[in-house]
Design a protein with these regions (language model features):
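Short beta-strand scaffold segments in enzyme catalytic cores
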Residues: 25-31
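Active-site segments that bind and position negatively charged phosphate/pyrophosphate groups
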Residues: 22
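Zn2+-dependent cytidine deaminase-like catalytic core
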Residues: 39-137
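Short beta-strand-to-turn element immediately C-terminal to the catalytic PLP-Schiff-base lysine
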Residues: 31-32, 115
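Iron-sulfur (Fe-S) cluster-binding modules
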Residues: 140
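Short, basic/aromatic recognition patches
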Residues: 2-19
């Protein structure tokens, strides 16, 4: 799947975002090594701490399908966002989402694909989370 095709799926997911408080809508499309796509959107809550990001929604969807238990590694995620769903800038993942990615992904190969509506950029997880803490740090 091309980065642009994955980005289009993220844009579609953004249409489902529930953001009545901030108005900032985000969509994500997660690709695993089998070619399966898992979409997510942000879902806000009046108790702000209960809000969940689009990226984590996509990862939780991936996990609940059993893909994690079957060892199907995520290989890329496209993320798009903007106020009222209008894309004007890049929407990089927050720190919590980066940490979730670190749990399940190879930081050197997993790609984060972003757009500002004019250009598409791609980064590895290691580039956006240098010195990331992951499961390998807990190995005995």
């Amino acid at each position: 799947m091309t980065p642009n095709a994955l980005m289009e799926l993220a844009k579609d997911a953004m249409l489902r975002a529930y953001a009545p408080y901030s108005g900032y809508k985000v969509g994500a499309a997660l690709l695993d090594e089998s070619g399966q796509i898992y979409r997510g959107c942000n879902v806000e809550n009046a108790s702000y701490g209960a809000t969940i990001c689009a990226e984590r929604t996509a990862f939780m969807y991936w996990a609940q399908t059993g893909a994690a238990m079957r060892g199907r590694k995520p290989v890329a995620i496209a993320i798009v966002g903007g106020k009222d769903g209008v894309i004007t800038d890049f929407a990089p993942p927050c720190g919590i989402c980066r940490q979730v990615m670190m749990e399940f992904c190879d930081p050197d190969t997993f790609r984060i694909i972003l757009t500002n509506g004019k250009e598409v950029r791609s980064y590895t997880l290691a580039e956006i989370l240098p010195l990331g803490f992951g499961p390998s740090h807990l190995d005995e």
